[in-house]
Amino acid sequence: MSTLASSASVFLVHPPLPPSPPQAGNHSYLTTLGFGYSIAIALGFLVLLSTVLLSSYICCRDSRRRTTAVESTGDRGGSVILPRIIFVAEEDNEDLEAGDVVVGLDQAVINSYPKFHFSKDTSAASSDGFGGGGDTTCSICLCEYKEAEMLRMMPECKHYFHLCCLDAWLKLNGSCPVCRNSPLPTPTSTPLSTPLSEVVPLSQYAADRRRARR
């Protein structure tokens, strides 16, 4: 009997062990890793979006600056840059012949010419077909006369001009700018006028007057 009992105990089969429960540490690690990836992706998207917006702003600003520069350059190119020189004459007359010398008037003689304030009524009343009566534009600077503006008149032909325009003209040329009549008591004919190549019109003076009227 003891032999059978001992042999029977040899064939006893033990039941399998239950599986061990999952560890909580691995689950928390995976959760933290997924959250980190989400934050990294969100930050990368924000950086990319900020870069695109900043690049677009810089491109738009540069394009606007180029457009403004082109427009300003076009305005300057379309406008006429007028010289600031009133009259230019050759000062070295040693190489000129005696007949080609520009004849001008002294300031004392110029000051003796009559001067008056311009008035539209006076201009209309003097418009009788003689001399400069009725003229409303200076033939030197091509600007219209303003009310009460000081003018100077040539004594013989009665043509009148802006005082400063005529004074500058007569310092280089003793004849009237319109009719070339000369008040100089010389036995010769009307003095030679200044060559056009040596005279620059009062364009800047005219431009300044136009700006002042605006």
Curated annotation (Swiss-Prot):
Transmembrane segments: 33-53
Keywords, sorted A to Z: Membrane, Metal-binding, Transferase, Transmembrane, Transmembrane helix, Ubl conjugation pathway, Zinc, Zinc-finger
Span of zinc fingers (RING-type): 138-180
Reactions this protein catalyses: S-ubiquitinyl-[E2 ubiquitin-conjugating enzyme]-L-cysteine + [acceptor protein]-L-lysine = [E2 ubiquitin-conjugating enzyme]-L-cysteine + N(6)-ubiquitinyl-[acceptor protein]-L-lysine
Top class in the EC scheme: transferase
GO biological process, one term: protein ubiquitination
UniProt note: domains: The RING-type zinc finger domain mediates binding to an E2 ubiquitin-conjugating enzyme.
Cell compartment(s), UniProt: Membrane
Name of the featured protein: RING-H2 finger protein ATL67
Main location, first listed in the record: membrane
Molecular function per GO: transferase activity; zinc ion binding
InterPro entries, A to Z: ATL67-70, Znf_RING, Znf_RING/FYVE/PHD
A Pfam family assignment: zf-RING_2
Pathway entry: Protein modification; protein ubiquitination
Record-level GO cellular component terms: membrane
PANTHER family: RING-H2 FINGER PROTEIN ATL67
EC number: 2.3.2.27
Domain of life: Eukaryota
Membrane topology reported for the UniProt record: Single-pass membrane protein
Family that this chain belongs to: Belongs to the RING-type zinc finger family. ATL subfamily.
SUPFAM superfamilies for the chain: RING/U-box
